[in-house]
């Protein structure tokens, strides 16, 4: 009878282990969007944005630079730049799951730690606005 109890316990343990290790769908707002700097100092700034499914339809990407920074080039083209505040904004529409790189070429280099970013989006499941802070 003891072997039945230990066998049942082992079977239950294996069943629970399998259940926990199965891939699960994302909950609303959980890890839908991520951001990581590929380059955060010098003249070339690159922010990698990763979007999971279900993708929000629109992303607002905000890059904070030192005030007065001169931008030589941007890819994609930004929608707004307030040089006095050092705030660059992109509105990315028709977003699909995948990776997006936002790049800036600056006239003068910025020091490490001199920038930060935000990614804003509406969670498709809950309808809440999410603000993701990105730091180098």
What are these regions (language model features)?
Residues 1-5:
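N-terminal secretory signal peptides that target proteins for export/translocation
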Residues 10-21:
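Bacterial N-terminal signal peptides
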Residues 24-40, 81-82:
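Low-complexity, acidic Ser/Thr/Pro/Gly-rich terminal tails and inter-domain linkers that flank the onset
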Residues 36-56:
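Short beta-strand elements of extracellular/lumenal beta-sandwich folds
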Residues 56-60, 64-95, 99-101:
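A surface/secretory-pathway sequence property marking extracellular, secreted
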Residues 56-62, 114-116, 129:
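Exposed beta-strand and adjacent loop surfaces of beta-rich binding modules
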Residues 94-114, 121:
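Low-complexity, intrinsically disordered segments enriched in Ser/Thr together with acidic residues
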Residues 120-136:
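Extracellular/luminal low-complexity Ser/Thr/Pro-rich, glycosylation-prone repeat/linker regions
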């Amino acid at each position: 009878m003891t072997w039945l109890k230990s066998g049942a316990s082992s079977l239950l343990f294996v069943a629970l282990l399998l259940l926990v290790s199965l891939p699960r769908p994302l909950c609303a707002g959980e890890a839908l969007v991520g951001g990581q700097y590929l380059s955060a100092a010098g003249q070339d700034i690159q922010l990698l944005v990763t979007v999971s499914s279900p993708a929000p339809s629109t992303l607002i990407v905000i890059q904070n630079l030192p005030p007065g920074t001169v931008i030589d080039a941007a890819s994609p083209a930004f929608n707004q730049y307030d040089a006095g505040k050092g705030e660059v904004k992109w509105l990315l529409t028709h977003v699909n799951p995948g990776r997006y790189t936002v790049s800036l070429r600056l006239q003068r280099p910025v020091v490490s730690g001199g920038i930060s970013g935000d990614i804003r989006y509406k969670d498709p499941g809950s309808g809440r606005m999410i603000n993701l802070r990105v730091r180098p």
